[in-house]
Amino acid sequence: MKMTFCRAVCLAAAFLLMGCDEAPETTTASPAAQVLEGKTMGTLWRVSVVGIDAKRAAELQTKIQTQLDADDWLLSTYKNDSALMRFNHSRSLAPWPVSEAMADIVTSALRIGAKTDGAMDITVGPLVNLWGFGPDRQPLHIPTPAQIDAAKAKTGLQHLQVIDRAGHQFLQKDLPDLYVDLSTVGEGYAADHLARLMEQEGIARYLVSVGGALSSRGMNAQGQPWRVAIQKPTDRENAVQAIVDINGHGISTSGSYRNYYELDGKRVSHVIDPQTGRPIEHNLVSVTVIAPTALEADGWDTGLMVLGTQKAQEVVRREGLAVFMIMKEGEGFKTWMSPQFKTFLVSDKN
């Protein structure tokens, strides 16, 4: 069995968004910018900051890593003692106390899930694990229909709710085996959280990324808007499809072309359709979303990726989203963008 995963290569200054939610690459050097980086949530984080010295940068590096470690402890499905996994391990159907951050993340995810007709489903964890993209080991054979049905029976957004009681936040499930997986929005939340840290530190010019989710404010070291390149879905890591000015927004890309494995002679995508219980097999290979927050962009790109081209376009038009799609067509690719996305577009390489 052959496994191929996303790997990030980081350079400096203007970040390159790569599919399957991996960490971005930079495209040009910028000696006036302090570039900090590290690891979190099984991926890479990167922060480019203008206007601070090396001493301040070293202090900021520590604060960033500490905050991201706390975010990972909150959201991880790989740490058995994380806040999320304690909820998952519990079979109690009573309201479960959680932090305000956890409640906000789940609320946003449930909202996007409803607007994508359940395609963005944070309860799909049993299916993700069954297909080998969670903490469990990869299967030796394609799961049987019975195994898929058994896993699907443990999923469903209707089985999870967020409760606010006099300012205290709770999650409640009505299935004891419900398993919540927030990896589809975790990177976006962490990127937004880093942006808030920059604001708290009085930093007005920054670009932050966690995996494939980014957020920015102000101008880069050259006094120009932060620009992000969307990669072509090929094996060439520096092949650029489009360039956008995210203008203080969040951006995230989801793709099916790098995070996969081969099993029984078939390519198995990490993107699981909650309706079928199986990895997606349609021709939509990359979705980029620009939204007010990186968390929203991170959630929307997953849901749209699951839906496939036609259904995703219907949702994009209905919700007025800024979206760029790349579809496989024969031996090549074709692209589509919403009118809202065009307002951010600097260059399209078609």
From Swiss-Prot:
A lipid is attached at C20 (N-palmitoyl cysteine). It is found in: Cell inner membrane. Changing Y78A: Unable to grow in minimal glucose medium; requires thiamine for growth. Is defective in FAD binding. Disruption phenotype: Cells lacking this gene are conditional thiamine auxotrophs, and display phenotypic behaviors similar to those of strains lacking isc (iron-sulfur [Fe-S] cluster biosynthesis) operon functions. It catalyses: L-threonyl-[protein] + FAD = FMN-L-threonyl-[protein] + AMP + H(+). One of its GO terms (molecular function) is metal ion binding. Mg(2+) binds at T184, D298, D301, T302. Residues 1-19 form the signal peptide. FAD binds at M41, Y78, A119, M120, D121, D181, E187, I272. Its cofactor is Mg(2+). The keyword Membrane applies. Keywords: Cell inner membrane, Cell membrane, FAD, Flavoprotein, Lipoprotein, Magnesium, Membrane, Metal-binding, Palmitate, Signal, Transferase. Its EC number is 2.7.1.180. Transmembrane segments: none annotated. Coiled coil: none annotated. GO terms for cellular component: plasma membrane. It is a lipid-anchor. A lipid is attached at C20 (S-diacylglycerol cysteine). Homodimer. Flavin transferase that catalyzes the transfer of the FMN moiety of FAD and its covalent binding to the hydroxyl group of a threonine residue in a target flavoprotein such as NqrB and NqrC, two subunits of the NQR complex. Belongs to the ApbE family. This is FAD:protein FMN transferase.
